[in-house]
């Protein structure tokens, strides 16, 4: 791809002084033509210009940010590698741009216009792009030598742009320069882009160079015209990669003074540069080796992702067994690196050099478990010196240095050392010494990052994996992670999220105390109709369909399913047709019957297993007016879908959940028993459950059958000392077949509904997690935060000790302070601005069991519309000079000081108005 044409109300952290009101953040832009786009990096910008053929439109981030994305289209030129080239009438080729090895096309020929719209623009519209960036508008000048030819070409450009605006009236359009036609098309476009104002590229080799004042003066003539039309003007300047960290921000400020939106990047435009706003780098690259085990089963994922996620960061797993180390340009999206390899890295000298190069870009590196090399002398360049241990069985060591960071769940074990380790210019976290005063530092913070090796990070005891180091503190200190507002998936409007989902297994199991009943009957009568909270129920097609395993029982089972799905509080879902046991065994679209259920005559089809089942549920088991419809697959078997299957569900807009082993208990109160929120494969996320199902708590359904009661321990331990998970009551339909298991369900539900919760459907939880992985956060020089991409995820979490009252902004409904964590509630908009300014008290929402569907806030007022799945409850802070009104009126209103508690007995929707006097 070539270059562009070259011619607190609550806020954060230790704020010691009140700041003046911070205005709307400056507009920013990014131009990224690479592949594997990072939405946490680009999402914050107002203009996101991309090479559309490098964008996977099925990934969640595209759906979140598509309104701000602009698809690149070259006008009057075409690259031979462009997919549209095959469909080009070659008679349109009238020349060659040798600098770019592209073909010049006759834009005055009506056939070109037809080709442009049919083969280059419309396919991208169909893929989901809404906005476009027209490049190479001046290519015609290479072939139009006479004034008449130029006039004709410019008229053709104007016609193309007018046609685009007429054909796609809601689309936005950016032009690269186009100065010659600006007077005729300015009303059809949103912005003008140009390049090389102070720093550009030139010559055959496109070398970086300074731009002359004469060239800037020439540009200013045309740019002033664009300003007069009130168009945004995007200026791209170019710097070598190694100069970006030191020079880019200076250049940004310089360009801003001219009234332009700056973007500073390398000439390739395939890494992330700098603009007026820049995203905090939330992604942490984690090097892994999947040559033996899939990432699902690696310690790096199972225990390493959660501490990052809790602090607002994202683990990005990178398999070095299949790919070389990323280039330094590719590393610009990352906030740090964790090396967590189970084998030594083969090209260890390259690994060390790579780490050293990253330091110029302030990307820190943390070694976990080992240094992953065989030649320890390579470590000397990192300030680490090793010597051999003569007595490899010696364990008589004393501790001479131990940070508070060490000894988190267990003290470091006394095990034999493999080498003595000394450090230079670092802070030792854990150092031991033998009787000969030979010392070894096993964990340290270093100028380039840090390390925790030889069981100073984690240790296995009785098959439990325990943290020796505090992972929250270790990751933060070693990688120099900033404290940031954390997009939080556990809480909504100040209350812990509660959802419940049921895997469809065993609907046909006979009830042990009444063989006339099926387990589906008792789940319906004793659970679904008795607890009004949202519950998502899946079915296995082969268990209930006429062409399934039980054709004689099918009519009765289908009747049960229809009764379940007729309930207002029940959401339908699929647990597939044949319950695949091992998803990675699907080869060439087929799955051997030994890896699934075996209905007679069935030929395996992935499409039928998932989308086909959802369609059948919606068409055959739901009333026409039933909402929500079935749109979620609950993974079966090993719950480990490979990337091609994840891509399938995203392509078909199907939600997914299951997997992850969260079953921390009083007997096993270790962080390793709490799973992360999900697992990424090639940009697609498998969403994990909140907690595990009853199969785990009953020893794989061998007993005790009351064992699911212990999930309450899990709920408690994932709430304090840190709220790590929502409450997810997750089980199988076969739990309705035994008294002990059914009573356990009642015990769990009864406990859950007594908590301070916000009940939602499973299909409402899943998109919150999907949002987490694409939210983009920026911090300005004035301690102002801008958070974008909060589409379904509506909570930001802060450390309570770091909070200060600040002005409540447009999209902020309120907040709730708990002992250690405080939660900020957002309105229906996807963007929020947090300004550090203390102000007098305003009315705000403290908590609610509902969802905010509309928020309107003035300087002296707030209006909220809320909708809940159960009778609405809310708590408000209402200053005494303010008046509260409700529609409809509530029967129970309790006031204590400035706190008003409102409880409805039936209504699930209400409008709240608070108006305050001057």
Residue ranges of model-derived segments:
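Helical hinge/lid and interdomain linker segments adjacent to catalytic or ligand-binding clefts
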Residues: 33-46, 52-53, 294-374, 503
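Metal-dependent polysaccharide deacetylase catalytic core of the NodB/CE4 family, i.e.
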Residues: 96-108, 285, 361, 368-380, ...
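Catalytic grooves of carbohydrate-active enzymes
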Residues: 227-240, 483-512, 528, 607, ...
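C-terminal domain-boundary segment and adjacent tail
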Residues: 261-278, 314-321, 477-494, 522-523, ...
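A glycine-centered loop/beta-turn motif at secondary-structure junctions
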Residues: 279-284, 334, 400-496
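Active-site beta->alpha N-cap acidic-glycine motif
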Residues: 331, 463-569, 619-638
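A glycine-rich, often tryptophan-bearing local segment used as a flexible ligand/cofactor-contacting loop or short
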Residues: 345-418, 422
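Non-catalytic C-terminal accessory domains or segments of carbohydrate-active enzymes
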Residues: 367, 751, 756-918
């Amino acid at each position: 791809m070539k270059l562009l044409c070259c011619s607190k109300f609550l806020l954060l952290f230790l704020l010691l002084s009140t700041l003046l009101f911070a205005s709307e953040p400056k507009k920013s832009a990014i131009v990224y033509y690479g592949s594997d786009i990072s939405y946490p990096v680009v999402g914050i910008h107002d203009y996101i210009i991309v090479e559309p053929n490098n964008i996977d439109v099925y990934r969640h981030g595209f759906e979140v940010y598509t309104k701000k994305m602009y698809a690149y289209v070259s006008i009057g030129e075409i690259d031979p590698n462009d997919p549209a080239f095959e469909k080009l009438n070659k008679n349109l080729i009238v020349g060659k741009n040798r600098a770019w090895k592209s073909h010049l096309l006759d834009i005055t020929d009506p056939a070109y216009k037809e080709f442009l719209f049919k083969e280059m623009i419309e396919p991208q519209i169909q893929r989901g792009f809404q906005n476009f960036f027209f490049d190479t508008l001046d290519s015609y000048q290479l072939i139009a030598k006479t004034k008449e030819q130029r006039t004709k070409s410019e008229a053709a450009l104007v016609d193309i742009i007018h046609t685009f605006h007429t054909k796609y009236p809601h689309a936005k359009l950016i032009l690269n320069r186009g100065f010659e036609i600006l007077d005729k098309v300015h009303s059809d476009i949103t912005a003008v882009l140009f390049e090389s104002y102070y720093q550009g590229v030139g010559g055959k080799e496109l070398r970086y160079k300074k731009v002359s004042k004469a060239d800037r003066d020439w540009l200013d003539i045309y740019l002033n015209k664009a300003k007069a039309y009130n168009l945004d003007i995007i200026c791209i300047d170019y710097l070598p990669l190694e100069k970006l960290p030191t020079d880019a921000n200076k250049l940004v400020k310089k360009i801003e003074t001219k009234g332009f939106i700056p973007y500073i990047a390398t000439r390739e435009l395939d890494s992330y540069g700098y603009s007026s706003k820049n995203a905090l780098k939330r992604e942490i690259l984690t090097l892994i080796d999947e040559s033996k085990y899939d990432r699902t089963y690696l310690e790096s994922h199972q225990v390493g992702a959660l501490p990052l996620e809790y602090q607002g960061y994202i683990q990005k797993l990178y398999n070095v067994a299949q790919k070389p180390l990323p280039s330094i340009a590719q590393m610009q999206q990352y906030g740090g690196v964790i090396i967590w390899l189970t084998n030594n890295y083969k090209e260890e000298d390259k690994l060390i050099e790579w780490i050293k190069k990253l330091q110029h870009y302030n990307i820190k590196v943390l070694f976990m478990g080992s240094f992953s090399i065989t030649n320890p002398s390579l470590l000397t360049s990192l300030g680490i010196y090793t010597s051999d241990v003569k007595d490899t069985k010696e364990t008589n060591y004393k501790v001479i240095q131990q940070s508070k960071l060490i000894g988190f769940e267990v003290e470091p074990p006394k095990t034999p050392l493999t080498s003595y380790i000394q450090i230079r210019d670092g802070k030792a976290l854990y150092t031991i010494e033998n009787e000969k005063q030979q010392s070894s530092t096993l964990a340290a913070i270093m100028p380039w990052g840090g390390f925790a090796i030889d069981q100073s990070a984690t240790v296995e005891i009785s098959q439990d994996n325990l943290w020796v180091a505090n992972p929250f503190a270790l990751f933060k200190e070693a990688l120099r992670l900033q404290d940031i507002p954390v997009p939080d998936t556990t809480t909504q409007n100040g209350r812990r999220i509660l959802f419940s989902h049921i895997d469809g297994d065993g609907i046909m199991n006979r009830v042990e105390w009444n063989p006339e009943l099926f387990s589906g009957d008792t789940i319906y009568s004793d659970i679904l109709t008795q607890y009004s909270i949202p519950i998502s129920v899946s079915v296995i097609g082969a268990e209930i369909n006429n062409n399934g395993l039980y054709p004689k029982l099918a009519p009765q089972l289908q009747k049960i399913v229809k009764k379940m799905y007729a309930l207002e509080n029940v959401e339908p879902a699929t647990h597939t047709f044949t319950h695949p046991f091992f998803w990675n065994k699907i080869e060439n679209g087929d799955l051997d019957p030994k890896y699934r259920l075996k209905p007679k005559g069935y030929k395996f089809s992935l499409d039928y297993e998932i989308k086909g089942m959802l369609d059948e549920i919606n068409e055959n088991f739901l009333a026409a007016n039933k909402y929500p419809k079935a749109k979620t697959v609950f993974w079966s078997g090993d719950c480990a879908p490979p990337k091609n299957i994840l891509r399938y569900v995203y392509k078909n807009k199907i939600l997914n959940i299951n997997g992850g082993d969260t079953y921390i208990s009083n007997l096993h109160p270790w962080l390793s028993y709490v799973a992360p929120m999900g697992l990424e494969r090639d940009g697609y996320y498998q969403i994990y459950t909140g907690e595990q199902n009853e199969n785990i708590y009953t020893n794989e359904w061998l007993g005790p059958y009351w064992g699911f009661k212990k999930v309450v321990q899990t709920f408690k331990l994932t709430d304090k000392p840190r709220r790590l998970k929502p409450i997810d009551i997750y089980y199988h339909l076969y739990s309705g077949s035994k008294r002990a298991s059914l009573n356990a369900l009642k015990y769990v539900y009864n406990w859950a509904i007594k908590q301070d919760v916000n009940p939602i459907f499973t299909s409402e939880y899943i998109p919150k997690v999907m949002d987490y992985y694409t939210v983009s956060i920026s911090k300005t020089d004035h301690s102002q935060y801008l958070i974008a991409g909060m589409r379904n995820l509506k909570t930001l979490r802060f450390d309570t000790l770091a909070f200060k009252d600040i002005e409540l902004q447009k999209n902020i409904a309120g907040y709730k302070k708990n002992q250690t964590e405080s939660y900020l509630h957002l309105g229906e908009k996807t963007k929020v601005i947090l300004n550090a300014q203390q102000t007098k008290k305003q009315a705000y929402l403290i908590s609610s069991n509902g969802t905010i569907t509309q928020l309107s806030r003035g300087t002296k007022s707030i209006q909220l519309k809320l909708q809940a799945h159960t009778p609405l409850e809310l708590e408000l802070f209402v200053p005494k000079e303010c008046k509260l009104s409700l529609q409809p009126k509530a029967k129970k209103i309790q006031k204590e000081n400035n706190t008003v508690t409102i409880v409805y007995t039936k209504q699930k929707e209400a409008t709240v108005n608070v108006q305050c006097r001057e």
